[in-house]
Amino acid sequence: MRRTGIISFAAAGLLMMASCDSLDLPGMFWSQSDTVDSRFAQSMAYNDKNGYPAVISDTDEYSVYVFTDFHTDGDTRNLDAFTKVYESAPAPLSLYLGDVVNSKDADWDLFLKATRPLSERGSLFVTPGNHDLYFGLWPEYLSHFHTASYWFEVICPGARDLYVCLDSGSGTLGRDQRRWLETVLEAKASSYRHVTVFTHTHFFKIDASQGHTSNYDINETYDLLHLFSKYGVDLVLTGHDHTAEHTVFGGVDYYVVPALENLKPEPGYALCRMGECISLTFKYL
């Protein structure tokens, strides 16, 4: 009887949460957005038509701002504060690692307006998070950012760096994207000074303060870690867990970048310096 009561209480709690505009409970178990392979096909259709961008740096050393998990929900104060930091020391590019919005009624334009200086004074590259797929929001993401799986290069006077963006918003790359990733790395990685992969879902999790946060299937994790090491990836940047972490595995530096979300007592981001060597520092507002 007690067991039935606990189950009933839990079920009632889940139903209550499911009615919340910021929590897509069904979407946590089966996606209401397109599958990862379908999303990848749509991204490739855009890439095939529009090509892959290049960012020009006037110097061989340059900075990259990395931020994530703002969960836009009406108030952009932390995003505004971060943008002011950027404006005080602009960089040629910035990376956003996912979870642009937090609910089905979120205003995507708020994020775009707040980050406009990053895209006007440099280039802003975005990857989707799980919250950007909940409530069937993939078409919204696509209408604003056009692609979720792509690569670009930074061209310096004496070097070139490769960046690869992966769509891991549903906790997997899928077969097609995984195949594409290896094709890109095999064909290009050896021609670049540094290779950086950025995506939403983390590969390692040490800090337990956020409770459980989903990641890849263990076999997929092993496969991707091997792939990154095999082709000499230098840096893997992820978000999702909201905490700052750094793990070195197989010669690759894996970072989880802290969340910029308003609710966080210590909202943060990362500042990466690319040159002969790579340095990354966690910063807090």
Where are the predicted features?
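Bacterial N-terminal signal peptides that target proteins for export
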Residues: 1-7
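C-terminal motif of bacterial Sec signal peptides marking the signal peptidase cleavage site
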Residues: 16-19
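Extended active-site neighborhood of metal-dependent phosphoesterases/phosphodiesterases
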Residues: 33-48, 106-194, 214-230, 235, ...
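Hydrophobic beta-strand anchors of alpha/beta hydrolase catalytic cores
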Residues: 64, 94, 163, 195-196
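Short acidic, glycine-rich surface-loop motifs adjacent to enzyme active sites
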Residues: 188-208
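Histidine-centered catalytic micro-motifs
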Residues: 196-203, 234-244
